[in-house]
From Swiss-Prot:
Gene3D superfamilies: 5' to 3' exonuclease, C-terminal subdomain (1.10.150.20), Nucleic acid-binding proteins (2.40.50.140). Residues 68-146 are annotated as: Domain II. It comes from Prochlorococcus marinus (strain NATL2A). Has three domains with a flexible linker between the domains II and III and assumes an 'L' shape. Domain III is highly mobile and contacts RuvB. Keywords: Cytoplasm, DNA damage, DNA recombination, DNA repair, DNA-binding. GO terms for cellular component: cytoplasm; Holliday junction resolvase complex. This is Holliday junction branch migration complex subunit RuvA. SMART domains: HhH1 (SM00278). Residues 1-67 are annotated as: Domain I. Pfam families: HHH_5, RuvA_N. GO terms for molecular function: ATP binding; four-way junction DNA binding; four-way junction helicase activity.
């Protein structure tokens, strides 16, 4: 059973709504499905370290990769629920960050869970019944999710800035240019952190597009 892989990216792929990478690990190519929100990072990084969940079937083996181990472990809990397959599990982790999803399940927020494509009211309620008392380990390192909300938001904002940095770096901009230009985002860190925390994956992508356009416009003005 494969649990973790580190290797060089040789290809990114897309099949319908599924996206992923092929990693060269010791001369062997592993095809791994990723969360779509991780694909932007996949486009600019050459080396990956991924936590893996492996599913073996008669027609082949499927690998699901995650940047963070708690994403992989929560994915395993989700697909242990009767009627929920790996694609719905991936969709849920695409829609929500781990703390948000754990919080929704523990607080019986079935309406929030149904925001995920493929999750109806009945499946959402089944998730809550089967998992709400099994997720304590995801919050053991924190007093409660609510008490650490500010830390979670700050961490999300930091990751968001890192992604923007990588994209700008891949476009040829240097460190000093990037650090100066992203001040238009960091100057409103609190506001943008709250916005990120309450946004869906699609809304986050739209926000990133908006910020990138603003930054590129600022960089263009400086070069003229």
């Amino acid at each position: 059973m494969i649990s973790w892989l580190k290797g060089e990216k040789v290809h990114t792929w897309k099949i319908s709504s599924r996206k992923g990478v092929v990693l060269n690990v010791g001369g062997v190519g592993y095809e791994i499905q990723l969360l779509p929100k991780q694909i932007d990072k996949a486009e600019v990084l050459n080396e990956f370290e991924l936590w893996i969940h492996q599913i073996d079937r008669e027609d082949g083996t499927s690998l699901y990769g995650f940047i963070e181990v708690n994403q992989r472990d929560l994915f395993r809990e989700i697909i242990s629920v009767n009627g929920i397959g790996p694609q719905i599990g991936m969709a849920m982790l695409e829609e929500f960050e781990v703390p948000q999803l754990v919080n929704a399940i523990e607080n019986k927020e079935s309406n929030l869970l149904t925001k995920t494509q493929g999750i109806g009211k009945r499946i959402a309620e089944r998730l809550i019944v089967e998992l709400r008392n099994k997720l304590q380990r995801f919050t053991d390192n924190d007093k409660t999710i609510h008490e650490n909300k500010n830390d979670i938001e700050a961490n999300q904002f930091s990751k968001y800035i890192d992604e923007i940095y990588l994209i700008l770096n891949s476009l040829g901009y240097v460190d000093n240019e990037i650090k100066e230009s992203i001040k238009i985002i960091t100057i409103n860190e609190k506001e943008n952190s709250l916005l990120l925390n309450s946004s869906s994956a699609e809304e986050k992508a739209d926000l990133m597009d908006k910020h990138l356009k603003e930054i590129l416009m600022k960089l263009s003005e400086k070069s003229t």
